């Protein structure tokens, strides 16, 4: 049975939503949940029926959101440090954390280590599209400054993820730019374009609107652009939801129409709801690391665990290393 390390203290709302998400996941999948945190707080939240699936690791500290990621290595008693160590030592196959993302990334990179030939790990996230499929975007925050070589490696990692985890047989990989023409972009993306042209999966430059139209399976960008893209998308989705709700309240006819379209709205919510995705994998490290939002609901935690299980059961890291080995200079 696969063991998953879970940072039980990492979220913004304490251990309750995280533990609820773990229990919801255990209703559907068998795995060993290794809960890292204050045992006095988390153990009472576990019903007796689930006790055989849960292991506890005591942690006396919580790495708060306000702390600097550079201090993570010093905080050896923190829940995130101990959870990462469980993966590093081979006691767990994956880690899920809704805590400090910078601390999670730095600890995963320094303690678990990078895959062979990977210069920099990248955070990948799934974006909804109009074709009822997902687009994988990376990097969305791990690296604000990238060289062309880094973007090229992201393309290989993203393509591997699309094949192994998303089950896309022949994924299309695009480079996010300010136009589709080969000449568009800055110096880094132009150089990356030349390097990515070696990949059979590469279709060239893509524009921002193609993230959501389903025409591309994997989109590559640096973490600065990717994080702005991610936060903007979250903001737009939230704003549209609020606009629809306010508009419905203003008219009885709109209210009736909304009731008739309840199923449509529910399907739309599922498409754009972050909770449906759960978390973002950190690609390029030796084991599975899933980074979840600090405000993760139980549903998001459950789906993050499902992501971790799918990753742990796959052969993706071997595939990434094999693909990168073909391009080592």
From Swiss-Prot:
GO terms for cellular component: cytoplasm. The keyword Lipid metabolism applies. Keywords: Cytoplasm, Lipid biosynthesis, Lipid metabolism, Phospholipid biosynthesis, Phospholipid metabolism, Transferase. It catalyses: a fatty acyl-[ACP] + phosphate = an acyl phosphate + holo-[ACP]. Coiled coil: none annotated. It is an enzyme of class 2 (transferase). GO terms for molecular function: phosphate:acyl-[acyl carrier protein] acyltransferase activity. Pathway: Lipid metabolism; phospholipid metabolism. InterPro entries: FA_synthesis, Phospholipid_synth_PlsX-like. Pfam families: FA_synthesis. SUPFAM superfamilies: Isocitrate/Isopropylmalate dehydrogenase-like. Gene3D superfamilies: Isopropylmalate Dehydrogenase (3.40.718.10). Its EC number is 2.3.1.274. It is found in: Cytoplasm. One of its GO terms (biological process) is phospholipid biosynthetic process. Belongs to the PlsX family. Catalyzes the reversible formation of acyl-phosphate (acyl-PO(4)) from acyl-[acyl-carrier-protein] (acyl-ACP). This enzyme utilizes acyl-ACP as fatty acyl donor, but not acyl-CoA. HAMAP family: PlsX. NCBIfam families: plsX (TIGR00182). Homodimer. Probably interacts with PlsY. This is Phosphate acyltransferase. It comes from Campylobacter fetus subsp. fetus (strain 82-40).
